[in-house]
Amino acid sequence: MRIVVAGVMAIVSTLTSAQQPWQKIQMPTAAQVAQIWKAPPPEYGPEPYYGLNGTVDETVIRRDLDTMKSLGYQAVTVQAGYGMPFAYLSPEYFRFFRTFVEEAKKRNMRVWIVDDAGYPSGFAGGKFTEQKPKLRMQALTAAQRIPATAGESVKTTVGPDTIAVTAINADDGTTVPVTVTNNAIDWTPPGGGWTVIVVEHEFKTSPTRSDTNPKRVKDGTQSLEDYLNPAATKQYLEFTHEQYKKAVGDEFGRTIMGFRGDEPDYSINGLPWTPEFFDRFTEIKGYDIKPYLAAFLQARGAKLTDQQLRAKADYYDVFSQMFRDGFFKPQGDWCAANHLEYQVHLNHEEMEMDLTRSEGEFLRDMQYVQVPGIDTIWHQIWKDTISDFPRLAASASHVYGHPRAFTESFAAYRPAPDVDMARYILNEQFVRGVNLVETMYFPATSTPDAHKSSYMEDPAYPALLTYVQRMSYLMSMGRPAASVALYLPSSSMWMGDAAADAAFVTTERLLSERQIDFDIVNDGALAKDLTAGHGAFETASGNRYAAVILPDISLLSQAALDRLHAFASGGGHVLFLGRTPSLISGKTILDARSATASDFSWASVAPGELPPTPTPPAQPPASPPTALVVPDAIAQAVSAAVPLPDVTLDTSDTALRIIRRRLKDADVYLFFNEGPEALSRAVTVRSEGKTAELWDVQTAKIVTTKATGEKGTIRMQLDMKPYETTVLIVR
């Protein structure tokens, strides 16, 4: 009997530990997709962001879930809000949440749980401040900046939290360590002007907007956890996720899809730090970073020496590794172990220079996140902006083998979109690889002065949600097919290289306007994460890159360089735009060697400079962006690096955007006309298929269209209205 029971339990364990279909890459046939896409499973959304505010009760949630369902929502992202009749994370709250999940289940809706009572994620409704203050976020700061001149002694006391005291020469940036004796310094500078900087560690948090904060403001009264400390994240999971598991764990992987995080970052004046940082830094880099800290904490505008810039890049390299391993990975692992997915978006996705300071490295942070995301707020995506940043989330999914990438859309939009503009904003993201949609904002009807976002009141809105549901499902099926990789120059940005950032953003635009489907990859992907083949790099999703483009970068690792060389030797195309990197790093960036011409003799290099692309704005711009003028040398080099593009037009059109996916027996092409003019072009697409079909996402109708085929391509006429999408299936 014991043997039988053990066998049954083993089978049950195997079944429950297996990934659900929506959690893994699926390769159905086009016929199988056609059978399902008219009414896709609820796991593919869309979902509103729902705030449990005010005197919320069972009557309220039933009414609100019914409204969501009638609009066409198939899932809901739910956050504990303000003014609830029970305390957040209390037994009463979890009893109510159990009821909420049961009501969603009755309606065959799925639930994503917001992991905190506001944002950024990681304060557990104030519990770190109240109960675990030693696990709060910490930083290194300049506690004192003392001017000093030759011959005048600097005498002062320093606090017990002092890490280092360093004098910095005002003329050349050289530094001198200052000895601390009995919590005091006594130092006389040599000639010239100096600043003595006292570096301390302190508990310092990014501001949090918590619905448990009685002041209803975004401030530092409820501290975030120490993101760099796995023990702090373990405590966070105990405060939050484990309690949900006790209350509703039987619905994990069934009604409950996973946990949703929001903008974890270091929006602080100082350097991200944790007590284990220096030991970890020495383990990774092999040297002591403390002598350089004061240079990093100089007043705004201070110029760092080349050596200091390199050491600072090492600091942010280690910071980003510790952020990934201390915060994102434990949550992704916990969700996977509990049959769930972790979805999260960061801050500053559209401003990578800022992101490298606050979060380190986008793709590194997202490596173990099952559903990487972005958010689009303010005026970031509109008909008068250039916004390719959603491709970051899709690329993280593609590189690391996850089927979906999500968007939080429409929060704090200026102006608020109507239904037509909402469709445009979502289509801009679909064609860049996003395939799971969360919309802002649906407050509980118990919320004082509650009102849904205005576009939700439009009679045309349910039709848009039907469209979104089908598009999300269709673009989640199969695998990505991008054959071009664009390098994200985070390590150059760690050294303050704004030119590399600007070139990266404009190269995104260049490729998009030339209908070149691409993924974004980082140094870690090139150095080790991608599977190297003969003239190809393969992602965990199965798409293979035949070309890698590196835009105007100043730094590259030796490991990435070596693998790029082997890739090119096998027939892959490697293209440097503008310049080749001047530095090649090994274990450290501090000791990076100077690059030589022979390092890149095997690669293509296109001289010239791309014009900057405007950053997606917070407010409507005074005028739309001007047309992108690409230097001839760069345009020709890109064409040579991508000799067999997925899509070729008989006449160029920079308004057309495309993305390609691969089903078991068919190619999927999504076209989006982002321009205000109708488009009529003969289009040639790569495919071994013989039959071309147009799939109408709004009506679910499928019609065969006239096409001719030759040598692995299909040619057809493409006619599109302004701001229209077209789905082409070739099988």
Where do the protein language model's features map onto the residues?
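N-terminal pre-domain segments of enzymes
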Residues: 19-43
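Sec-dependent signal peptide recognition
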Residues: 1-8
